Amino acid sequence: MKKTFNEFKDFIRNKEVAVVGIGISNIPLIHFLVKLGANVTAFDKKSEEALGEVAVEFKSKGIKLQLGENYLDNLEGFDVVFKTPSMRIDNPALVKAKESGAYITSEMEEFIKYCPAKIFGITGSDGKTTTTTLVYNILMTEGYKTWVGGNIGNPLFSNIEEMKEEDKVVLELSSFQLMTMKEEINCALVTNLSPNHLDIHKDMDEYVDAKKNIFKYQEVNDLLVLNRDNDITNSLVKEAKSRVMQFSRKEEIESGAYLNGDKLVLLGKEVCALEDIKLKGMHNVENLLAAFCLVSEDASIESMAKVATTFTGVEHRCEFVREIDGVKYYNDSIASSPTRTIAGLRAFEKPVILIAGGYDKHIPFEPLAEEGLDKIQALVLTGLTKNKIKDAFDKAMKDRGINIPIYMEDGFNEAIYRAKDIANEGDIITLSPACASFDMFPNFEVRGNKFKEIVNNL
């Protein structure tokens, strides 16, 4: 039996609550907990000066602050600790807090536990945001009051009292959010799995185990959607407790969704023609097939077809920016892993000038080099990983006897100017970094917006 939110309200009232991280998602959470009668202390590495008006507002509401480099030193003595998603549960400060009797949780765990509406959870290495947005749009088109959150949209926990049982909730869930998840998710989707975030996870096994939590606590009547074309996700079928639907662009699946020549098919019925889809690339065909499966019990073929033939994509995902002197510029800043960049490269009909490099997530670049050689006419590298990427391409070029020019640039701006200088009419330039942005930018959106700003001023 699903818990009611009144139970949480009774539980949290007058509790001593620590919230770790004063970021975009936690600010509404902190305000909400105060409104519910909790005594909140907010923890953050930033200084009071760096927090600015947020710190002033918090103090005016009686919210205590623990700030600075050693902000986690005083995490003991709390009844409840809300951790940030990327904070490992074996963090020494959390271990101490738990030993002192604290209940360790996160906003997403509590939201899923008490959410009255049907939840559609989406995870995977690539395609999460596009698929989440597709599912959201299909359910909206069908006429449901639909909420979207997790990695995209707004934090939802503070809106939970506005939600009704007949509403739908669509969540994009990262491996970090899922690491400690022990809640039932009614309709779960794993788009695909490949090495990612190995800077945070101990190894690939831990990363996959985190992703499995999206379906680990399902019941027999729930739904799990898996990618048959991906070896890892296909192997998860045998671990499912719920009903399973699969999707494929390589083989027919009568009880799922598949690409049949030039038609997208769900449960034997044509949804739309391949030529009518607005999204570029076969990876987006997979995203559509996955979305169709996930909403198959809640939306009509007509709603699916309408979205499939009108949806043009999400910002920073193979996003066309402009054409200058016959050269087309694309922003694929979301591509923070080699597999994501490979998918982006496959979307183009010809080899491109690729701008890549960034923060090191300790993911191998050899797969990108091996496939990328046929899809890249020139490579412009920048960021912390530029030498690692160059080494992978140098080896692949030597092994195959192929040579593509590689340019090494110190700055992000310089990389874009270099790409412009080497491009000729008819060429395509794409920013598809294969890395996270944290060496130069707070997130991929800021990186993508900077790229667009520079390109629009060329």
Swiss-Prot record:
Binding site for ATP: G124, S125, D126, G127, K128, T129, T130
Enzyme class: ligase
Pathway: Cell wall biogenesis; peptidoglycan biosynthesis
InterPro entries: Mur-like_cat_sf (IPR036565), Mur_ligase_C (IPR004101), Mur_ligase_C_dom_sf (IPR036615), Mur_ligase_cen (IPR013221), MurD (IPR005762)
SUPFAM superfamilies registered for this protein in UniProt: MurCD N-terminal domain, MurD-like peptide ligases, catalytic domain, MurD-like peptide ligases, peptide-binding domain
PANTHER family found in the cross-reference section: UDP-N-ACETYLMURAMOYLALANINE--D-GLUTAMATE LIGASE
Family: Belongs to the MurCDEF family.
Protein name as catalogued: UDP-N-acetylmuramoylalanine--D-glutamate ligase
Organism: Clostridium novyi (strain NT)
